[in-house]
Amino acid sequence: MEGKAAVTTSTEHGDGEASRTAARTVVSGSSRGGAASRALSVADLILRVVAVVAIVDSAIAMGTTNQTLPFFTQFLRFKAQYSDLPTLTLFVVANSAVTAYLVLSIPLSVVHIIRSRASYSRLVLIFLDSVMLALVAAVASASAAIVYLAHKGNVRANWFAVCQQFDSFCERISGPLIGSFAAMAVLLLLVLLSAAALARR
């Protein structure tokens, strides 16, 4: 009887140790998962700030682009500005809209740092980030085509390269495209980060 009691006690002790070990393993795994999700959320916040800077610079640079050329007399001048081209106007409007969205999404990104296991809000961000990525890609690509025509023209369509006269204007409208394409890359990274954070849950 005493032997059976000893065996029973030993078995119960072993079961208790196994349960505690399993519990510690679960807690440890949960802690590591939470730390990884929090790190992804911090990276998300930093990338959103970077995207805001890139988009704002692009919109401001494009929106303030103009050049005036004197023609024969000081009273007759040729002027070129971004609003003369509807595609570049759309570029400024779209970049402004994306900037507003990114600024509004920053508080939600901060919430994800505090509550790393939030999932519904991450799904919303993935959807909206994807929409903004598509918008930026569309306007940046269309604007790049217009800038190319401004530099090279199209002989078959009788479109002349205006950059031969408005060289400063063309330099100014080329620069914002770099920031816009950089913002595209950042938005793509944001979508991937949110997807990775959801996959770790």
From Swiss-Prot:
Extracellular membrane side: 63-87, 144-172
The entry's keywords: Cell membrane, Cell wall biogenesis/degradation, Glycoprotein, Membrane, Transmembrane, Transmembrane helix
Glycosylation sites: 66
Location (main, coarse): membrane
Top-level taxon in the UniProt lineage: Eukaryota
Similarity annotation: Belongs to the Casparian strip membrane proteins (CASP) family.
One GO BP: cell wall organization
Pfam short name (any one): CASP_dom
Quaternary structure annotation from Swiss-Prot or TrEMBL: Homodimer and heterodimers.
GO cellular component terms attached to this protein's record: plasma membrane
Listed transmembrane segments: 42-62, 88-108, 123-143, 173-193
Region annotation Disordered: where it falls in the sequence: 1-23
Function according to Swiss-Prot or TrEMBL: Regulates membrane-cell wall junctions and localized cell wall deposition. Required for establishment of the Casparian strip membrane domain (CSD) and the subsequent formation of Casparian strips, a cell wall modification of the root endodermis that determines an apoplastic barrier between the intraorganismal apoplasm and the extraorganismal apoplasm and prevents lateral diffusion.
Name of the molecule in the record: Casparian strip membrane protein 4
Coiled-coil region: none
Protein's cellular compartments: Cell membrane
Entries under NCBIfam families matching the protein: A_tha_TIGR01569
Topological type in the membrane: Multi-pass membrane protein
Residue intervals on the Cytoplasmic side: 1-41, 109-122, 194-201
